[in-house]
C-alpha cells in the first residue's frame, strides 16, 4: 500500500513496502519509522529544499501512522472535473496564474462532492451542461498558511460536455483562458502543469507520454 500526497510540486509517498527503494534516485529523501511529532518540521524542510523532489516515509504500522499523519492537518475538501468532449478525445483545461490546470474548488457546507465538482466546472469555465461519467481517485495536497498546516483533499470526477459550448474563464478566480486540449496539446504543455494533475491524468489512463 502506498499513499501519495503532493506538496508544492513535489511528491510524498507513505508506505510500508521497502521494495520501493529499488527505484529511488539521488533526489529522494527517505525517512524510516519517522516520529509523528516531527512530521510537520520534516515536511517544511522538504518543501523548502531545492535538492529533493520526493519524500518517502516508511512505516511498518502503516494504517496507524497514516491516520496520525492525516490528523496533523486541517482538512480542506474540494472537488473538480476532468471534462471530456463528446468524442472523448479532448480535455477541458484552464490557465490560472500562468499554469495549466483542471477546474476545481472548495466544497460548500452541506454540498455533495458531485454537485460541487459540477458547480466548480460551471463557474470556472462557463461549461454547465455536464454529464458525470464516474468518480476518480482523490488527490491530496499539503500547504502551509498563517502557521497552520492544511491538507486539501480534492474529489475528482470524469465528465462529458459538448465541445461547441461557449468557454468563459472566471476572471475573479484569476483564470485567464479556458481551452480544449488534444493529447498533443497536453504533451506540448506538460512542463507547465502541476504534478498532481499529471498524476491524475496518467493514473487514470487519460494520457500517455
Predicted regions and their residues:
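Conserved Nudix-box catalytic region and its N-terminal flanking loop in Nudix hydrolases
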Residues: 21-33, 84-122, 127
Amino acid at each position: 500500500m502506498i499513499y501519495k500526497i503532493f506538496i508544492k510540486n513535489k511528491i510524498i509517498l507513505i508506505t510500508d513496502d521497502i521494495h520501493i527503494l529499488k527505484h529511488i534516485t539521488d533526489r529522494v529523501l527517505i525517512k524510516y519509522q519517522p516520529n509523528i511529532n516531527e512530521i510537520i518540521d520534516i515536511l517544511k524542510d522538504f518543501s523548502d529544499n531545492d535538492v529533493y523532489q520526493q519524500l518517502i516515509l516508511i512505516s511498518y504500522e502503516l494504517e496507524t501512522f497514516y491516520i496520525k499523519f492525516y490528523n496533523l492537518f486541517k482538512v480542506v475538501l474540494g472537488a473538480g472535473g476532468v471534462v471530456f468532449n463528446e468524442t472523448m478525445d479532448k480535455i477541458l483545461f484552464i490557465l490560472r496564474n500562468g499554469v495549466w490546470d483542471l477546474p476545481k474548488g472548495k466544497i460548500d457546507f452541506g454540498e455533495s462532492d458531485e454537485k460541487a465538482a459540477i458547480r466548480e466546472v460551471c463557474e470556472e469555465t462557463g461549461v454547465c451542461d455536464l454529464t458525470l461519467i464516474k468518480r476518480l481517485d482523490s488527490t491530496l495536497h499539503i500547504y502551509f498558511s498563517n502557521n497552520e498546516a492544511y491538507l486539501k483533499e480534492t474529489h475528482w470526477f470524469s465528465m462529458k460536455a459538448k465541445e461547441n459550448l461557449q468557454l468563459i474563464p472566471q476572471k475573479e478566480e484569476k483564470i485567464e483562458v479556458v481551452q480544449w486540449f488534444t493529447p498533443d496539446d497536453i504533451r506540448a504543455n506538460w512542463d507547465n502543469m502541476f504534478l498532481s494533475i499529471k498524476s491524475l491524468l496518467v493514473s487514470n489512463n487519460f494520457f500517455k507520454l
